Amino acid sequence: MSKPGGHARHGRRDGIDPVLRSRARRRALQAVYAWQIAGGFAKQVIAQFAHEQAHEVADLAYFESLVEGVLSNRSELDTALTPYLDRGVEEVDAIERAVLRLAAYELLYRQDVPYRVVINEAIETAKRFGSEHGHTYVNGVLDRAAVEWRKMESGASGA
């Protein structure tokens, strides 16, 4: 998986493959969405989707950390998102709600992931799976939230 000279795939020195991370995020979205609809325990949801994911190359460890993180911190994530929403969390479309929870988890708990990556991934995922204009809603919420949640990072870049 590494290129000559020790560089990871796609030229990343940190060994993180952005394609595999994107796939992990998409699978995590599906798992969080299923959990929102059917409920269940984090380990059950992870086990179900990890088994299905075995047929698709993705960052399984990242998938598991996202799903576990969102499910175990749902209340805190919803509280953090609330000031940036124009309606109650449960009133947000289920796909957009899952996208927002995943992105909120990454923005708040995964400081190693640049906020622009989190927002761009969330927008692309909302475009792919959400309602026609869901991605614009997701973008607006996350842009406002990132200014507060990632002050140092967003302030330094002029966002």
From Swiss-Prot:
Q: Which first-to-last residue range defines the signal peptide? A: none
By its UniProt entry, which InterPro entries does this protein fall under? NusB-like_sf (IPR035926), NusB_fam (IPR011605), NusB_RsmB_TIM44 (IPR006027)
Q: Which UniProt keywords apply?
A: RNA-binding, Transcription, Transcription antitermination, Transcription regulation
This protein's GO cellular component annotations are: cytosol
Q: Tell me where on the tree of life, at the top rank, the source sits.
A: Bacteria
Primary role: Involved in transcription antitermination. Required for transcription of ribosomal RNA (rRNA) genes. Binds specifically to the boxA antiterminator sequence of the ribosomal RNA (rrn) operons.
Q: Which family does it belong to?
A: Belongs to the NusB family.
What is this protein's record name? Answer: Transcription antitermination protein NusB
Give the organism the record lists.
Xanthomonas campestris pv. campestris (strain ATCC 33913 / DSM 3586 / NCPPB 528 / LMG 568 / P 25)
Which gene is the coding source of this polypeptide chain?
nusB
